[in-house]
Regions:
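Charge-dense, helix-prone N-terminal extensions
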Residues: 1-113
Length: 113
């Protein structure tokens, strides 16, 4: 599979809508770029140009996504990537895939009851 079709690729606006649809999610800012938090913890960010997002996955979740969709997901550079931080190019992502991965990142950071 190549890049997502023009009709299905995710825009920064759609990404925001998906992230903010999760319970208690808010948009904030970290080092000058948008981030998305739950319970005060960042679960996702957008880069300055809003062309890709970073999801705070576990290393196991990251590995699963890299195996399932290597053309869409890649580890962040350095120690962050080793911890599970995963970059997703919005132009290659589809809403259903991104929704599922965002939910994982949100669950990782959401307050435990």
């Amino acid at each position: 599979m190549g890049a997502a079709s023009e009709e299905s690729k995710v825009t920064a606006r759609q990404f925001r809508k998906l992230a903010l649809s999760l319970p208690d999610a808010i948009e904030s800012e970290h080092m000058g770029h948008p981030d998305f938090r739950v319970g005060g913890k960042i679960f996702a960010t957008l880069n300055f140009e809003e062309t890709f997002c970073v999801l705070m996955l576990t290393p196991e979740q990251q590995n699963d996504w890299l195996n399932r969709a290597p053309q869409r997901f890649k580890p962040c550079k350095g120690a962050w990537g080793l911890r599970g931080c995963t970059q997703v190019e919005l132009t290659t992502a589809t809403a259903p895939t991104l929704r599922q991965a965002l939910k994982m990142a949100w669950t990782n950071k959401a307050p435990k009851e």
